[in-house]
Amino acid sequence: MESMYSREQYLSLCKELEKDDYCYYVLHNAVISDYDYDMKMQKLLAIEAQHPEWKVLWSPSMRLGDRVSGNFPVVAHSHPMLSIANAYTLEELNDFFSRVEKTLGYAPIYTLELKIDGIAVAIRYEQGILVQALSRGNGQKGEDITANIRTIRSLPLRLPKDAPEFLEVRGEVFFKRETFEQINAAQRQAEKPEFANPRNAAGGTLKLLSAKEAAQRNLELSVYGSLSDENTESHYDNLMLCKRWGFPIFGQPRQCQTIAEVVKSLDEIEGLRDQLPMEIDGVVIKVDDVEAQKALGMTAKHYRWALAYKYAPERAETILENILIQVGRTGVLTPVAKLSPVFLSGSRVSRASLYNEEEIERKDIRIGDTVYVEKGGEIIPKVVGVCLEKRPEGTQPWVMPEFCPVCHGKVTRESDKVSVRCTNPLCSAGAIEKIRFFVGRGALDIDHLGEKVITKLFDLGVIHRCCDIFKITEEDLLQVPGFKDKSVKNVLKSIEKAKQAPLDRFIAALGIPYVGVRVASALAQHFLNLEAVMGASLEELKSIEGIGDKVAESIEAYFNQQDTIEEIQKMLSLGVNVLPYHRESSSCLGKTFVITGTLKKMTRSEAEASIRNCGGKVGSSVSKSTDYLVVGEDPGSKFKKAQELEIPILNENDLLKILYPN
């Protein structure tokens, strides 16, 4: 069929819609009605359906979303995405200024930006076209989330002609307060779990398998930096360039000539905090001069030229309606405050942490009290105090129950006199929590097995222990309300995938007391296979760096239990293959480094930790077994000895290239 439109008309329509999007989502100035915009978009979609070969990567239709693949490939960042150190007091802030001035020899200009509580991303453009977007991930590698990032209406899909040929921008993806409330209202309507806060909602949206669904949620982006060959010597000027190229930046960045100006601006911004459309938890302070940033360098974890000044947590007043008891995966009873709902830091709070019985007693918290609630780190609500003037008459001090609220078995008090534990191995609460942990994020990461599904399967008698996960059948899942053929297939596929379990994740999933992801990784790197971990002696466990006596004793006791051995053997018989740990190829692997002198871009302890993380060893003295000597300023006698032994000498930059080759 002959087309009613030419390719030139199609491209012109793309440009019109591109301009309409920019005016509405970046300048917040609608230039056409919603109806006219929709008519243009329908026209564009019709042309692209008739001429798919005309479709360009920057077409506004790309924002409408499509289904993405079931996994998000992991890609190395062009430059590490490090975190920013936090400061909570003026004293910590002044320490930062002093360190900067001491290193540079002068007081620099600073740029201030809003610290938006969102998800950090890196977005890459080539020849002016958006080609890839990555999550922050571990700072070295991130997940490819390009399809969902394209749905952000304020983000340009193509850049003006004066933009660099290759450009990477970094920014924060977030939700406005109003949008977040709408999303949670939709979750309640659909009888789905609400998001705890806007940051969690943004993270969950970026991981949606349907970009079309992501597009409906109206994500926002605020750019905070760029990487290109055309960057100027001023960070502030680079931000203004980004703005000129069409990138959104929420809250005008401020340039401060003096420390006094910085402190004044921090106070002014805090006063405007409640008026902002999104959540911020502080202000990021950056040395403005790019060359000065390079001179200040970085540590293994964060940049030395930037600091996040965090405001005091927001506080709300509400009524403590009840104190509930949660039973964790290890049987520990934890008191939780049930509150009259109150809005705090961008989310509705109805429960809060009370930590333990000792903390409740220390603060004299009673049911019926008017309490003060804060968000620790702006995430986890906690009860921080009581308004005694409003205490009702007749309230009684709260005491921990003597029996488990779930199985009614007697509880025992741990030797630390703080932890209270249900020791009944058949307690359903502990069993369900243990299974939830086993399949959750950071463990085996089995998709589609949430709390409600696990509880239902437990109640049906399908699962009682973690190993039962690998016996689940199609018939079992069809008993769960709401599960259809497609859902069943997704769960079974995830379970099958989880059978190929990396050693460190498998150890972490077991839920051994005091063993998290870091300790599990250390065990995997040391022992390399599951059999060796299970047979490790107490002395061998204690010899591993970062594992103390208490953790070592917990690991040994866990693997000496007959129930543990039988459950792991059952998993193996059901097809679970615990993959041996393979150290990544690295020029550090197995090499011994010795450090002498003062390093500028990281502390000695940070350098040593980075070497060990890459599979290297750190020696205290130079010998024939030393592979490299790292030399900083004012090296000692080790430098001379290394020269005599003809040991390779590295400066700090050489070391950084080995540690971070990408």
Curated annotation (Swiss-Prot):
<feature type="binding site">
    <location>
        <position position="310"/>
    </location>
    <ligand>
        <name>NAD(+)</name>
    </ligand>
</feature>
<dbReference type="GO" id="GO:0005829">
    <property type="term" value="C:cytosol"/>
</dbReference>
<dbReference type="Pfam" id="PF01653">
    <property type="entry name" value="DNA_ligase_aden"/>
</dbReference>
<feature type="binding site">
    <location>
        <position position="422"/>
    </location>
    <ligand>
        <name>Zn(2+)</name>
    </ligand>
</feature>
<feature type="binding site">
    <location>
        <position position="427"/>
    </location>
    <ligand>
        <name>Zn(2+)</name>
    </ligand>
</feature>
<dbReference type="Pfam" id="PF00533">
    <property type="entry name" value="BRCT"/>
</dbReference>
<feature type="binding site">
    <location>
        <position position="113"/>
    </location>
    <ligand>
        <name>NAD(+)</name>
    </ligand>
</feature>
<dbReference type="Pfam" id="PF03120">
    <property type="entry name" value="DNA_ligase_OB"/>
</dbReference>
<dbReference type="InterPro" id="IPR018239">
    <property type="entry name" value="DNA_ligase_AS"/>
</dbReference>
<comment type="similarity">
    <text>Belongs to the NAD-dependent DNA ligase family. LigA subfamily.</text>
</comment>
<dbReference type="Pfam" id="PF03119">
    <property type="entry name" value="DNA_ligase_ZBD"/>
</dbReference>
<dbReference type="InterPro" id="IPR004149">
    <property type="entry name" value="Znf_DNAligase_C4"/>
</dbReference>
<dbReference type="InterPro" id="IPR001357">
    <property type="entry name" value="BRCT_dom"/>
</dbReference>
<feature type="active site" description="N6-AMP-lysine intermediate">
    <location>
        <position position="115"/>
    </location>
</feature>
<keyword id="KW-0520">NAD</keyword>
<feature type="binding site">
    <location>
        <position position="172"/>
    </location>
    <ligand>
        <name>NAD(+)</name>
    </ligand>
</feature>
<keyword id="KW-0460">Magnesium</keyword>
<keyword id="KW-0464">Manganese</keyword>
<keyword id="KW-0862">Zinc</keyword>
<feature type="binding site">
    <location>
        <position position="136"/>
    </location>
    <ligand>
        <name>NAD(+)</name>
    </ligand>
</feature>
<keyword id="KW-0227">DNA damage</keyword>
<dbReference type="GO" id="GO:0046872">
    <property type="term" value="F:metal ion binding"/>
</dbReference>
<dbReference type="GO" id="GO:0006260">
    <property type="term" value="P:DNA replication"/>
</dbReference>
<dbReference type="InterPro" id="IPR010994">
    <property type="entry name" value="RuvA_2-like"/>
</dbReference>
<feature type="domain" description="BRCT">
    <location>
        <begin position="583"/>
        <end position="662"/>
    </location>
</feature>
<dbReference type="InterPro" id="IPR033136">
    <property type="entry name" value="DNA_ligase_CS"/>
</dbReference>
<dbReference type="InterPro" id="IPR004150">
    <property type="entry name" value="NAD_DNA_ligase_OB"/>
</dbReference>
<keyword id="KW-0234">DNA repair</keyword>
<dbReference type="InterPro" id="IPR036420">
    <property type="entry name" value="BRCT_dom_sf"/>
</dbReference>
<dbReference type="InterPro" id="IPR012340">
    <property type="entry name" value="NA-bd_OB-fold"/>
</dbReference>
<feature type="binding site">
    <location>
        <position position="404"/>
    </location>
    <ligand>
        <name>Zn(2+)</name>
    </ligand>
</feature>
<protein>
    <recommendedName>
        <fullName>DNA ligase</fullName>
        <ecNumber>6.5.1.2</ecNumber>
    </recommendedName>
</protein>
<keyword id="KW-0436">Ligase</keyword>
<dbReference type="InterPro" id="IPR003583">
    <property type="entry name" value="Hlx-hairpin-Hlx_DNA-bd_motif"/>
</dbReference>
<feature type="binding site">
    <location>
        <begin position="83"/>
        <end position="84"/>
    </location>
    <ligand>
        <name>NAD(+)</name>
    </ligand>
</feature>
<dbReference type="GO" id="GO:0006281">
    <property type="term" value="P:DNA repair"/>
</dbReference>
<dbReference type="InterPro" id="IPR001679">
    <property type="entry name" value="DNA_ligase"/>
</dbReference>
<feature type="binding site">
    <location>
        <position position="407"/>
    </location>
    <ligand>
        <name>Zn(2+)</name>
    </ligand>
</feature>
<dbReference type="InterPro" id="IPR013839">
    <property type="entry name" value="DNAligase_adenylation"/>
</dbReference>
<dbReference type="InterPro" id="IPR041663">
    <property type="entry name" value="DisA/LigA_HHH"/>
</dbReference>
<dbReference type="GO" id="GO:0003677">
    <property type="term" value="F:DNA binding"/>
</dbReference>
<dbReference type="InterPro" id="IPR013840">
    <property type="entry name" value="DNAligase_N"/>
</dbReference>
